[in-house]
Amino acid sequence: MGRSPCCSKEGLIRGAWTAVEDRTLTAYIKAHGEGKWRNLPKRAGLKRCGKSCRLRWLNYLRPDIKRGNISHEEEELIVRLHKLLGNRWSLIAGRLPGRTDNEIKNYWNTTLGKKIRPQTSRESSKNNLTRKSKGKQPVIPPPPSAIRTKAVRCAKLLAPAKSPPTHGPLFLNQPVEKSFAVLEENQSQISKNPLLCVENSHGTEPLEFSFHDQFHHNNGLCLEGLDDHDMVFKDWTASHEFLEVEGNCTLDLESLASLLDCEEWP
C-alpha cells in the first residue's frame, strides 16, 4: 500500500502565500520547531497543505536564507557541481550555504543553462572532431621515387706513361720483336710484287717464303735460353751474336727479284 495523503485537500487555499500566512507560519515554527508537517497546518490554523508549509519555510521563511542575486563565484560553483552531480539540486544547495535547491534550480533553468549550452555544444563538436581525427588512420606518404643511375662503361683509360725498362729479360726481347715486325712487313711487300710470282703446274701463285716459321724457330731458341736468367746474364756474347744474325735476316728485295727472274728456278 502507498503512503496516505497528508490532507484531503478539500477547502484548502492554493496559489501565492500572503504576508499574514508567512507571519503565522514563522511564529508557529519558532514556538514549536520544525517537523510534523502533516499536523502543522491544523495546529497553526492555516488552510494550507503540509507540503506547501514545508516548502514555504525551507525556501523562503528560514532566517539563514541568503537573499539577493547569485554572485559570479556562486555561478562557477554551480556549474562545476552540475557537471559532477547533474540535476541533484538538493545536493548542490547543500554545498552553497544560504541558497535553497529551488532557488538554484530556477536560476539554472532561467539563466545559467542558456549560457552554458552554446559552450557545451562547441566543446562537444570539438571533441567529436578530435575523436574523428584520432580514429582516422594517418595517411602514409608514398616513398620517394628512387633515382637509378645508368651504368656507363668507361671507354678510355688514362694511365701514366711508363718508361720502358732498361734492364732484364724484356729489354733483351725488344730487338727480336722489332725484327719480327720488319719481316712481316717485307713478306707483305713480296706478296704484292708481281715480279715475285712464279709459274708452277697449278698456275700462277705468289711465292711465299717461310720467314715466319724460320723466325719463330730461332725466336723459340732465344726464348728458351731466356727462361734461365742465370744463363742469359752469363753468356752476353751469344745473345749479341744472335741479334746480329737476326739483323742480317732483312732481305734485299731487289736481289730477291733478280733471283726469281732466272730461268733455272725449279
Curated annotation (Swiss-Prot):
A Pfam family: Myb_DNA-binding
Residue ranges the UniProt entry marks as DNA-binding: 37-61, 89-112
Biased segments, Polar residues type: 114-128
HTH myb-type domain segment(s): 9-61, 62-116
Superkingdom: Eukaryota
InterPro entries from the UniProt entry: Homeodomain-like_sf (IPR009057), Myb_dom (IPR017930), Myb_TF_plants (IPR015495), SANT/Myb (IPR001005)
Alphabetically ordered keywords of this record: Activator, DNA-binding, Nucleus, Repeat, Transcription, Transcription regulation
Signal sequence, start to end: none
One GO-annotated biological process of the protein: positive regulation of DNA-templated transcription
Subunit composition and interactions: Interacts with BHLH42.
The name this protein goes by in its record: Transcription factor MYB123
